[in-house]
UniProtKB/Swiss-Prot annotation:
CDD domains assigned: Argininosuccinate_lyase (cd01359)
GO cellular component annotations of the record: cytosol
Listed GO MF terms: argininosuccinate lyase activity
GO BP of this protein: arginine biosynthetic process via ornithine; L-arginine biosynthetic process
Record bears the keyword ATP-binding: no
Broad class of enzyme this protein falls into: lyase
Family annotation (PANTHER family): ARGININOSUCCINATE LYASE (PTHR43814:SF1)
Protein source organism: Escherichia coli O7:K1 (strain IAI39 / ExPEC)
Listed name of the protein: Argininosuccinate lyase
Major localization listed first in the record, in broad terms: cytoplasm
UniProt xrefs under Pfam families: ASL_C2, Lyase_1
Subcellular location: Cytoplasm
């Protein structure tokens, strides 16, 4: 059933209808459309369009339809309705007859779809926040279990300084906490109701839009009808949050893919999140992580696409805005799936501590400690940096770590070096000295874990 037609003397070409219809994707707004219609029916009572008895009849029919949709959502796609609004109205008319045709009084699909989409966004943000916090908790638990797992930290993919696997986990907790904050911020701004703004100029009925917003669970009503039906900032904000969040998950995946390689060998992934090769029987591929990394691109694309769609649009509603949904739905679905999958990857991951320790002891990750030692002996840092560089070259030439060079060799580079240098060069000393807030010392890591646990409850 089309919601328009009196103006036209010819039927729409079937090819145009297929091109124009949006039911194949906006069917996902069915529950929100029904909930919004119930609230609108209540508002129509306050302005005398519906009697209380009529409203009760409509609400009962809409609630029955809501339960029917929840039980069998696939029925929507069996229809040839133009969009979800047409489908809901058609089903309502089937149930209550002519009374169903009164429901759209004073309402436009422009404010209707804007309301539906915001309600859907609120519901989905709630799911994303839950999944985000679950992943944070999984990372914190993994950190707690691996506080003593020393491994190399990297810059430029070169071994740099020793860290712990716990400290690595907590780095991603910080990123996810920012993702959580971005979602909460976006939720505050989208929590305003556009219902009652009509096509663009507002409704001709003196409806209390603040009351209407409250019925729908919004914090307040929007202040400008023209902006309200034109606004898709919430779509951009959520896509932006998703794009950033997926970058974090992609980096998480890339790190673990590297840690899982035979060359690094720091972790082993569970069989539950890996797959094999059809040819090479020895293979155990990190497919879950590779898919997380790969899916990041499609989310970035959704954000870029929506920015380009909106950038040249005049106010108010334009059919271009129908393109807001597919990218948003796909991006947030993808982000949610990847959050769940990342948590599953952590469930069963094995940290290979001996290999991590061995790698941390290689690559001269304690060179900075030797430079700091020289500074403590009164050598200017730039000079100390140069001295240690020369010592590293000699250690490489001899095929030894710095701590295995005899004192006589070390003193060739600086006479201030004494026997007290050797405890300084141990991995544990390297960790213990990083005791400022945010550092990798055992005390700081333990405090960070406790803080995260308290924040996450």
């Amino acid at each position: 059933m089309a919601l328009w037609g009196g103006r036209f003397t010819q039927a729409a070409d079937q090819r145009f209808k297929q091109f124009n219809d949006s039911l194949r994707f906006d069917y996902r707004l069915a529950e929100q459309d029904i909930v919004g219609s119930v609230a609108w029916s209540k508002a129509l009572v306050t302005v005398g369009v519906l009697t209380a008895e009529e409203q009760a009849q409509l609400e009962e029919a809409l609630n029955v339809l809501l339960e029917d949709v929840r039980a069998r959502p696939q029925q929507i796609l069996e229809s040839d309705a133009e969009d979800i609004h047409s489908w809901v109205e058609g089903k309502l008319i089937d149930k209550v007859g002519q009374l169903g045709k009164k429901l759209h009084t004073g309402r436009s699909r422009n404010d209707q779809v804007a309301t539906d989409l915001k309600l859907w966004c609120k519901d989905t943000v709630s799911e994303l926040l839950t999944a985000n916090r679950q992943l944070q908790s999984a990372l914190v638990e993994t950190a707690q279990n691996n506080q003593d797992a020393v491994m190399p930290g990297y810059t430029h993919l070169q071994r740099a300084q020793p860290v712990t696997f716990a400290h690595w986990c907590l780095a991603y907790v910080e990123m996810l906490a920012r993702d959580e904050s971005r979602l909460q911020d976006a939720l505050k701004r989208l929590d305003v109701s556009p219902l009652g703004c009509g096509a663009l100029a507002g409704t001709a009925y003196e409806i209390d839009r603040e009351q209407l917003a409250g019925w729908l669970g919004f914090a307040s009503a929007t202040r400008n009808s023209l902006d309200s039906v034109s606004d898709r900032d919430h779509v951009l904000e959520l896509l932006s949050a998703a794009a950033i969040g997926m970058v974090h998950l992609s980096r998480f995946a890339e790190d673990l893919i590297f840690f899982n390689t035979g060359e690094a060998g720091f972790v082993e992934l569970s069989d539950r999140v890996t797959s094999g090769s059809s040819l090479m029987p020895q293979k155990k591929n990190p497919d879950a992580l590779e898919l997380i990394r790969g899916k990041c691109g499609r989310v970035q694309g959704a954000l870029t696409g929506m920015m380009m769609t909106l950038k040249g649009l005049p106010l108010a509603y334009n059919k271009d805005m129908q393109e807001d949904k597919e990218g948003l739905f796909d991006a947030l679905d993808t982000w949610l799936d990847c959050l769940h999958m990342a948590a599953l990857v952590l469930d069963g991951i094995q940290v290979k501590r001996p290999r991590c320790q061995e790698a941390a002891q290689q690559g001269y990750a304690n060179a900075t400690e030797l430079a700091d030692y020289l500074v403590a002996k009164g050598v200017p840092f730039r000079e100390a940096h140069h001295i240690v560089g020369e010592a590293v070259v000699e250690a490489i030439r001899q095929g030894k770590p710095l701590e295995d060079l005899p004192l006589s060799e070390l003193q060739k580079f600086s006479q201030v070096i004494g026997e007290d240098v050797y405890p300084i060069l141990s991995l544990q000393s390297c960790l213990d000295k990083r005791a400022a807030k945010g550092g990798v010392s055992p005390q700081q890591v333990a405090q960070a874990i406790a803080f995260a646990q308290a924040r996450l409850g």
